[in-house]
Amino acid sequence: MRVAIEVADWVAVCFNAAVTETYRIPDKRRHPGMGRLGPDLCESNTDPSVAVNLLLSHKVGADQLGEVLLDQRVVRGLGNLYRSEVLWATELSPFARIDSLTERDAIRLINAATTMLRANMQRAECAASVAGKGGLAVYGRNGQRCQRCGETIDCRPFGQHGRMLYWCRGCQQHHDPHQEMQTENMPIDPHPAAQAYLAGLPWNRNVS
């Protein structure tokens, strides 16, 4: 199923949606879950401490950090690309259990996400806190060297929806549970929207 939301200046397209739901703003009872959305880090009036508290109080402590960051009830606005970039910037393992995080970890993570998202709202190309080609540190760079430690960047489908996760085993070891994990030898994120984005990155363009 494909869903498109169109306004005067933008069109947002969702590919391969397993389930879609709609609701009317005047009557949120049609979709009571909308009342439980977390704070949007892109909004200037958002208090980041709210997201910190929601992250630390996540109801299932054994859930992995990389999955929880995409939970809209915890935080909005992050998305798959910045999930990978923010975890790299803070040197946190995406496989860390939520109940292993300290308050300092959560504050660093949310502050990094807030800074990164707001800085990129007006940019044509996404950029992480440490800029490499295209401004990204790990997303779309599987098989390349980490610019911080020199190890090879890995990727694998991760979480309930199988979104592609990019991370560095060498320097993202904080709270890593040291579980054996198999990485996938996949050149790019298989999601259609991600394929279109990654194909346009400088190092993926065909040079004639």
Located regions from the model:
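Basic, nucleic-acid-binding surfaces and adjacent catalytic neighborhoods in DNA/RNA-processing proteins
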Residues: 54-208
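Phosphate/anion-contacting hairpin/loop surfaces
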Residues: 1-77, 82-89
